[in-house]
Amino acid sequence: MLETFPIHMTSFKQDRQIRVYLPKGYNHGKKKYPVLYMHDGQNVFNDEDAIGGTSLELEKYLDERGLEVIVVGIDLNTEDRLNEYCPWVNGEYSRKIIGQLQTSGGKGKEYVEFIVNELKPFIDKNYRTIKDHTAMAGISLGGLISVYAMCRYPHIFRNIAVFSSAFFRNQEEIEKLIKESDLSLVETIYLDSGDKESGNKEMINKEFLHSNKVIYDLLKEKVPRTEFEIISGAEHSYAFFRERAPMIFSFLNE
């Protein structure tokens, strides 16, 4: 069952659509459930709402398997996604991959604070949640902001799963943050990356993969249950992301 509603984002002075998946048995008991927060909400649950027409199809996947988890999808702002999902302004590593210096980014801190201070309290108040069993998952820039959220709030986001993360946008800063963060409360981290993220652009493929490997190495030092997979032939598109969606739940539920 999927519910949708707008919620006000104080820092951004705007409303944002929220999509909440409730497991099949939710309305037939008083059981409490763990919660998974995901970004790019339009692309999480079904193709009908997906911006590019292809989603992760999680509503169908979760219903078919009867998984007992509440999933909260936060809609993306199509005009400001890069700014909201990047905690810092894009740096030199980003320029190296893209080929030009960009000044996007820098609103990620406020976006994560919205999740922690406004959205999560609302979800915990209005749904039967296990408040201290909270995970986060994201794709591309959603992966970057998920790892940032974990570093800033490791006591909240103890389980993280990210696909094809665009760490390169804030490579220098996210490396520094990981090194400085106490992640002793974090339980599990799953990362992956395709080896053809940019199709036939081999230089970008190489740098993108290297970016993810560096982050994996840093996280593995701090969180023993950190896993990284290189997906052969996988490109940066939802056709490939959808195939890996089950990994979110198989890893987080171990």
Describe each region flagged by the PLM.
Residues 1-254:
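Non-catalytic cap/lid and distal C-terminal segments of serine-dependent acyl enzymes
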